[in-house]
């Protein structure tokens, strides 16, 4: 049905045929879209865009490389002259910065630990408190077992002292 010309009531056929469009169902006033006709143009546009961007980036990278080399050429004599001062100063600054970062990290860890401990003592049940309670129970059970075994061994030792022959 879609390949036949529509005529009669409902329009379509008479409008398209009277203006040279062919009047087939689905046609757009006599023009048709063929995607294969636009492919070479589309590929050419893609290629031109990609090549333009690529050349721009290549030029920018060349300028950056040139600027870096010129900067090193200018800075090298200064670095050689001042290296007996700059190298120890850089090492000292790095050690000082590392020390400050380490002490700050220890301070933050101490504050976090004290905050957790305060929450635990006040009964707010912070994260991980259930594992601490479980570990406390396990340690108490083991301590009770050791105490019972010690009593058993002490009682067995007294019993052996009372028997003759030992």
Curated annotation (Swiss-Prot):
| Annotated localization | Lipid droplet; Membrane
Asked if the Swiss-Prot or TrEMBL record annotates the protein with the keyword Acetylation, the reply is: yes
Q: Which residues carry this modification: N-acetylserine?
A: 2
For this protein's source organism, the top of the classification is:
Eukaryota, Viridiplantae, Streptophyta, Embryophyta, Tracheophyta
**Which PANTHER family does this one have?**
OLEOSIN
One Pfam family from the record: Oleosin
Q: Which GO terms describe its cellular component?
A: membrane; monolayer-surrounded lipid storage body
UniProt-recorded name of the protein? Oleosin Ara h 15.0101
- In this chain, the stretch annotated as IgE-binding covers 2-9, 141-155
Can you name the source organism? Arachis hypogaea
Q: Which UniProt keywords apply?
A: Acetylation, Allergen, IgE-binding protein, Lipid droplet, Membrane, Transmembrane, Transmembrane helix
GO MF terms here are: IgE binding
Specify whether Transmembrane helix is a keyword of the entry.
yes
